[in-house]
């Protein structure tokens, strides 16, 4: 297990990179950053075994290397506020800097602890041409960090999970500040979900650092165990295929482990995963949300606020991308996974998006997807929101589209504002009753 040091303070900015935009103290929480260092192990495919569609992959230790990285912690200040669940999120590095959800109201109001784990090389070194990794952003604070290769990311993630779990070393600096941890959940979104897919299929059979897994906006394919010196970048010129082909599902999640798994996908990932969909079981929940997409106008706006504060250079969002945030479903997944592990109450099964035999989504006369989880903005629409992209590039592909109805079209649907609000509220209440939305939404 890695050695913990901290809390970390100082640096050029005086705050942790990509910290929460919320005043967490007003929720009875505190923010603290720690470093963890030690020896990490890489893994390789066991000789003579097949890494096939069934996800029952066999891995074994390969090499070892020293590492040093960070974990950003949000925890209740009082034991009475803590529900016993720690969520460890695998920070996403697709943008060339770290992204993670530190603004979850379910976390802050529900009494969880959140640990944002930096486990990939690009998070520290950034991606060319504009390098905005931790060491470049604040060399004084983060200049000593080092992850030699993403090959070691899986074990680093395990070590971070163990360092905040119930059997952690209490004699060392404690990222949980003495809180009585009962369970640890692994969470990852997008590229990080792909890495967790590989972790679940190849590492979880012999490593019990995590009690449950939440994979959000997951494309249905695991990432490699070994990439060597490569800085993984989906925008590399080496990719000549279309985004849809590049991100198409390729494998299922293994079905022989006792840790529960929760998939929360938008319409976009539902399309990608069409060929590797799995039925709901006693250990798997698979949600698909119609009318949503990988990225929304709301998530882009939230990211821009963080980027402006932390003085980052970002890619301008395409106008007209999807306008229905899927974020509220992430909070619901936290709530349901916590109950699943703590009380044995499985999350509610939800309908899947309707597909033609060809793999195309069945759409209504307006072009809105049929089936699936139907948020109020889908069931009582003011626009046609979908995962259909406006342009062929990767960023447009992830953003889908939103086509607002004209004033005349709105009036043809709803007699007046009151009628619209009544219908919207009715669907929202139903979503709460079905366990799709939390009451606060």
Task: Give the location of each predicted region.
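C-terminal His-loop and adjacent cap/lid subdomain of alpha/beta-hydrolase
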Residues: 1-441
């Amino acid at each position: 297990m890695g050695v913990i040091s901290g809390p970390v303070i100082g640096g050029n900015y005086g705050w942790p990179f990509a910290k929460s935009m919320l005043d967490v103290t007003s929720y009875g929480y505190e923010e603290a950053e720690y470093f963890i260092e030690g020896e990490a192990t890489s893994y390789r495919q066991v000789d003579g075994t097949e890494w096939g569609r069934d996800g029952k992959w066999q891995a074994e230790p390969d090499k070892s290397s020293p590492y040093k990285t960070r974990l950003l912690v949000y925890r209740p200040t009082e034991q009475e506020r803590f529900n016993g669940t720690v969520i460890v999120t695998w920070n996403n590095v697709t943008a060339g800097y770290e992204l993670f959800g530190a603004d979850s109201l379910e976390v802050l109001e529900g009494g969880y602890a959140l640990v944002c784990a930096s486990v990939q090389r690009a998070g520290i070194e950034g991606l060319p041409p504009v390098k905005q990794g931790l060491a470049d952003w604040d060399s004084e604070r983060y200049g000593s960090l080092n992850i030699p290769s993403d090959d070691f990311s899986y074990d680093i993630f395990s070590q971070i999970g163990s360092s905040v779990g119930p059997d952690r070393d209490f004699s060392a600096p404690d990222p949980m500040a003495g809180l009585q941890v009962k369970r640890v959940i692994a969470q990852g979104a997008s590229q990080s979900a792909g890495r967790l897919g590989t972790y679940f299929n190849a590492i979880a059979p012999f490593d019990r650092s995590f009690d449950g897994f939440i994979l959000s906006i997951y494309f249905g394919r695991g990432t490699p165990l070994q990439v060597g010196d490569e800085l993984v970048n989906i925008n590399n010129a080496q990719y000549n295929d279309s985004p849809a082909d590049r991100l198409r599902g390729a494998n299922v999640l293994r079905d022989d482990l006792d840790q529960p798994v929760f998939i929360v996908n938008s319409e976009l990932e539902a399309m990608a995963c069409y060929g590797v969909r799995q039925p709901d079981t006693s250990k798997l929940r698979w949600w698909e949300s119609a009318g949503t997409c990988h990225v929304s106008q709301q998530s882009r706006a939230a990211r821009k606020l963080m980027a402006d504060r932390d003085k980052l250079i970002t890619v301008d969002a395409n106008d007209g991308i999807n306008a229905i945030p899927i974020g509220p479903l992430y909070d619901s997944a936290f709530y349901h996974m916590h109950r699943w592990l703590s009380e044995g109450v499985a999350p509610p099964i939800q309908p899947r998006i309707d597909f033609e035999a060809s793999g195309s989504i069945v759409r209504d006369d307006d072009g809105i997807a049929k089936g699936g989880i139907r948020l109020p903005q889908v069931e009582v629409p003011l626009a046609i929101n979908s995962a259909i992209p406006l342009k062929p590039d990767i960023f447009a592909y992830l953003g889908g589209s939103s086509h607002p109805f004209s004033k005349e079209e709105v009036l043809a649907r709803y007699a007046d504002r009151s009628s619209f609000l009544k219908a919207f509220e009715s669907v929202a209440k139903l979503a709460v009753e079905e366990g799709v939305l939390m009451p606060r939404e």
